[in-house]
A protein has these predicted regions:
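Transmembrane alpha-helices of multi-pass small-molecule transport proteins
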Residues: 33-84, 111, 169-176, 190-209, ...
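Glycine-/small-residue-enriched transmembrane alpha-helix faces in small-molecule transporters
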Residues: 1-42, 91, 152-179, 200
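Specific transmembrane alpha-helical segments of multi-pass solute transporters/efflux pumps
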Residues: 20, 24-25, 53-105, 141, ...
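Helix-helix packing/entry segments at the starts of transmembrane helices
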Residues: 18, 41-43, 86, 101-107, ...
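Juxtamembrane helix-loop boundary signature in multi-pass membrane transporters
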Residues: 1-16, 107-168, 278, 284-298
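Specific alpha-helical transmembrane segments that line the substrate/conduction pathway
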Residues: 39-50, 89-123, 128-129, 139, ...
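Membrane-interface helix-cap regions at the ends of transmembrane helices
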Residues: 27-30, 34, 48-68, 137-153, ...
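Transmembrane alpha-helical segments that form core, pore/gating elements
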Residues: 26, 52, 112-114, 118, ...
Length: 298
């Protein structure tokens, strides 16, 4: 069965969206000592929420009864997608190494595929399972720089617990986004979820600001929040929502695997970090995995 035009767009977004998320690696690297994690997450989703709401405000007003009726669902999605997957990553990044973050987050597509197959009854055959395994192998190959024996030397620290929590949270967010149908368009739905996320983040941010011993917001900190709002916030989440709707949670989950590869590309472009053969090998495995997961049965 050929892909529809919407599904073709969703497949194209699989290769575009990780570039937006890759920006978050740069933001997370620059944030410590500049802006507090909850404040960064709150400003990110406050600004991204406005970007979602402005073009969809008529729809939000039209469906206000639905939003108020399902407020608990939106609050949970906001907590999972904006608080835990936002602030917790920035907190964990203070004490854990980048290799640990990437390795733990690489579990997310596997968890999404398993939960989607068991709970949502999404069709997921053996070749698609092989695709997930290939993509996982590709990203681990890049993270370990082709030296698989170094996997035994990875040390776990307290920050890993924050990243593991964010990984599980992203799995639940992805599956629930697919599970809970909504009359709202992706844009309007994300506006409502962002508003809920800001509400969840607010008390933690107030506590963070009240206990701060240095200025809480500078021009550099605001710039980081704005950057996080526009690309890994507005653009990435909107694209992910569209992909979820058209392709399903399990098939879209492998997009996470492109993140470290795109981050390596951004580091090469912006930070002059070199690219090696293990990057090419990892990319080949990831692309093969994505093809198997998203192929169409005839």
């Amino acid at each position: 069965m050929p892909l529809t035009s919407r599904q073709q767009l969703a497949v194209a977004l699989i290769f575009i969206t990780p570039a937006f998320w890759g920006v978050n690696y740069l933001v997370a690297r620059s944030a410590p000592g500049v802006i507090e994690p909850h404040l960064l997450a709150l400003l990110r989703w406050l600004m991204a929420g406005l970007l979602f709401a402005v073009p969809s405000w008529r729809e939000l007003v039209q469906h206000r009864k639905h939003i108020t009726t399902d407020w608990a669902r939106y609050l949970l999605l906001g907590a999972l997608g904006m608080w835990i997957c936002g602030a917790w990553v920035y907190i964990g990044g203070r004490t854990t190494a980048a290799i640990n973050i990437a390795l733990i987050y690489a579990l997310s597509p596997v968890l999404i595929a398993v939960v989607s197959a068991l709970w949502l009854k999404e069709r997921f055959d053996r070749l698609q399972a092989l695709g997930v395994a290939l993509a996982l192998a590709g990203v681990v190959h890049v993270i370990l720089k082709g030296q698989w024996t170094s996997l035994a030397g990875v040390n776990l620290v307290a920050g890993d617990a924050w990243i593991l929590g964010a990984t599980v949270s992203w799995t639940l967010y992805s599956v629930l986004l697919r599970r809970w149908s909504s009359p709202l368009s992706p844009m309007a739905r994300l506006a409502a979820i962002s508003a809920a996320g800001v509400l969840v983040l607010l008390p933690f941010t107030v506590w963070e600001v009240a206990s701060a011993t240095q200025p809480v917001l500078s021009l550099q900190g605001f710039t980081l929040a704005l950057l996080a709002a526009v690309l890994p916030g507005f653009a990435a989440y909107l694209a992910y929502s569209v992909m979820q709707r058209e392709l399903g949670a399990a098939r879209v989950g492998v997009v996470i695997y492109l993140g470290p590869l795109y981050a390596a590309g951004l580091a090469w472009l912006l930070l002059n970090e070199p690219l090696y053969r293990f990057h090419a090998m990892g990319m080949a495995l990831v692309l093969a995995g994505i093809y198997l997961v998203n192929r169409r049965s005839h």
